[in-house]
Structure formats: structure tokens, C-alpha cells
């Protein structure tokens, strides 16, 4: 099957936590025999052995949007930020996306499905319906951020489902069983669960000296502050063990742990294999919504790491 994919980004240098999972998913599609054509919503097009990429028609608009988000990245400005971004995107970026998608469908001729992965739906509201007026083709949305992206939880950077029309899509795919009911209440015609997994070829263990007692890597501290305190802040303050922490926007007291800059992927694997115990400290929301999967336990297990995890409401 030939599939056209619109995804959040292909750029591993962008601070989007799901991008490694996205790469593995696309590689898996290729290995199952599918031909992929990928349009990134953010960042440059990147060709690989596993897919062809079409240039992002809104690259410079994305750069400008990054600057706007940094400018408005303050709680006092949060309401304004939520309200105007989807409007600007629908006016400026959606027409270019529609044009390049239609051009690609015409040129390739035999694309059998369109999949949108982790893109902000309220910024492209109406796009799927407009495409279907010309092409009778199934369009699926795969949201890697549910339940955080749901309007009831406010989203990550901004609330990108609020105001979207989920009925445009033939199916919505999410990694959270406990979120299905809300998706249907929001208008999804069909909702299915695909839990996270990992590519064992990517997460191969390496043999290195175990010189770190406890390791944690993750982005965002406030969303898991209680468990970080329990598993890192308090024990590192009283135990004579080496705690190492890395990530973005942690912003909380982490006791006597050693704080390192965010790892690249290859650095992270090396540190994981150096650690005697890897800490999986899940966000509160992912832990408390029933049967919501996160990729970290499977990544660590594939590398044969010893893992101590904060609890989940159904792993």
C-alpha cells in the first residue's frame, strides 16, 4: 500500500518527545511492505532508506511560529496564545498544505490512504473534508499525545484539539484506552487503540561499565513532580548513591542528583546502559488515565536495563 503521511516533524533536533517513536513507526510500515511519502508539518523534509519526503510548504511559517510561542510562553499570556494560533494557521498554513497534498495525490496517482500523525487538528480544520471532495480516500489521524492533547487536559504547548472536527477522520488512533470515551464525545466516528512499542534493532544494549547508580531522563518536571520528589529528590538527599538526571524544563528541586544537559539519542542509550537502575517517572496524567502506554518502559526493557517505575493505572 502507498500511504501519504502528514506528521508533526521528522527533525530529531526539535524538542518533540515523540519523534523517535515516529521514526520507528515509519520504519515499521516500510518493513511491512508499505511505500511511504511523508510531509513534515514542522521542520525540514528528511529522506531516509524507509520513506520519501516532500518539502514542508510552511517551513518559514513554522520558524516564525516558534518565535511567537517563545514570546508568549508565559502563564499570563496563555489564553491569548491558545486563541489566535489556530486562526493564523488556518489562514496561512492550511492552504499551502492542501495544495501540496493535492499535487502529491495527482502525481503519485495510486495513494491508497492518508495518515496524519501528531499534527494540531484545530490548525487544519476542514482540510480532510476538502481533500475528500476530490479524492475518495480514507484519512486517519494518529494522536501520539493523548490523553494530554485532549481539551479536558489542555494539551502540551497549546490546546490543539479544541475546536477541531474529529468527524472529518475515518478513524482516530491513540495509545490510551481510557481516552476513547472522550474522543467519541468530541465527535470521533471511530477510535482505536495502538499502544507504543519499540524497534529492537534501534534499542540494542551495549556493554559499558555500570558507573551510575540511578538515571532518569525526561522532559517536563511539573507534570510528574510528586513522583520525582519520591524517587529522586528525597532519596538523593539522604543516600550515598550517584543519581544522574537529564531532560528539558524540569524546573524542580532534584536534591543532590547530578543534572546534565538534554541527551542526544545516542548519548541517552549509552547512559541507560551505564546505569544500574533506570527510573521511569511517568507524567501524572499518563499514569492516572486507564491503560495509557508510554514508550519508556519498552525502550529500557529492550536495552535490558533494570527499571524501577512509578505506578500506572493499568500498564
Which sequence ranges carry the predicted segments?
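Nucleotide-sugar donor-binding catalytic core of glycosyltransferases
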Residues: 2-50, 57, 108, 117-127, ...
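A conserved catalytic-core segment of Leloir-type glycosyltransferases
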Residues: 41-108
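Acidic (Asp/Glu)-rich catalytic clusters
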Residues: 132-134
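Short, compositionally biased low-complexity segments
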Residues: 69-73, 143, 244-246
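Short N-terminal targeting/anchoring amphipathic segment
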Residues: 90, 102-123, 140
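A short, histidine- and acid-enriched strand-loop-helix "catalytic/donor-clamping" loop
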Residues: 140-155
Amino acid at each position: 500500500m502507498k500511504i501519504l503521511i502528514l506528521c508533526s516533524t521528522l527533525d530529531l533536533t526539535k524538542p518533540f518527545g515523540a519523534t523517535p517513536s515516529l521514526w520507528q513507526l515509519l520504519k515499521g510500515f516500510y518493513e511491512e511492505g508499505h511505500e511511504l511519502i511523508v510531509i513534515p508539518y514542522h521542520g525540514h523534509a528528511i529522506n531516509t532508506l524507509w520513506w520519501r519526503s516532500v518539502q514542508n510548504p510552511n517551513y518559514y511559517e513554522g520558524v516564525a511560529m516558534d518565535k511567537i510561542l517563545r514570546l508568549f510562553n508565559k502563564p499570563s499570556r496563555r489564553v491569548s496564545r491558545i486563541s489566535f494560533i489556530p486562526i493564523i494557521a488556518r489562514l496561512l498554513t492550511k492552504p499551502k498544505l492542501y495544495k501540496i497534498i493535492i499535487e502529491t495525490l495527482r502525481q503519485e496517482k495510486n495513494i491508497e490512504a492518508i495518515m496524519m500523525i501528531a499534527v494540531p487538528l484545530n490548525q487544519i480544520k476542514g482540510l480532510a473534508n476538502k481533500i475528500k471532495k476530490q479524492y475518495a480516500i480514507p484519512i486517519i489521524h494518529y494522536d501520539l499525545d493523548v490523553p494530554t492533547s485532549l481539551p479536558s487536559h489542555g494539551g502540551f504547548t497549546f490546546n490543539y484539539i479544541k475546536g477541531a472536527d474529529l468527524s472529518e477522520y475515518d478513524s482516530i488512533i491513540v495509545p490510551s484506552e481510557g481516552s476513547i470515551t472522550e474522543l467519541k464525545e468530541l465527535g470521533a466516528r471511530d477510535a482505536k487503540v495502538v499502544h507504543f512499542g519499540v524497534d529492537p534493532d534501534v534499542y540494542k544494549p551495549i556493554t559499558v561499565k555500570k558507573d551510575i547508580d540511578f538515571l532518569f531522563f525526561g522532559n517536563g518536571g511539573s507534570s510528574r513532580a510528586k513522583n520525582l520528589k519520591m524517587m529522586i529528590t528525597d532519596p538523593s538527599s539522604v543516600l550515598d548513591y550517584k543519581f544522574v538526571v537529564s531532560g528539558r524544563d524540569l524546573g524542580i528541586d532534584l536534591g543532590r542528583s547530578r543534572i546534565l544537559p538534554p541527551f542526544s539519542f545516542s548519548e541517552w542509550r549509552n547512559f541507560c546502559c551505564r546505569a544500574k537502575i533506570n527510573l521511569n517517572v511517568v507524567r501524572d496524567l499518563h499514569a492516572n488515565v486507564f491503560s495509557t502506554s508510554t514508550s519508556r518502559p519498552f525502550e529500557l526493557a529492550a536495552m535490558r536495563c533494570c527499571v524501577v517505575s512509578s505506578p500506572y493505572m493499568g500498564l
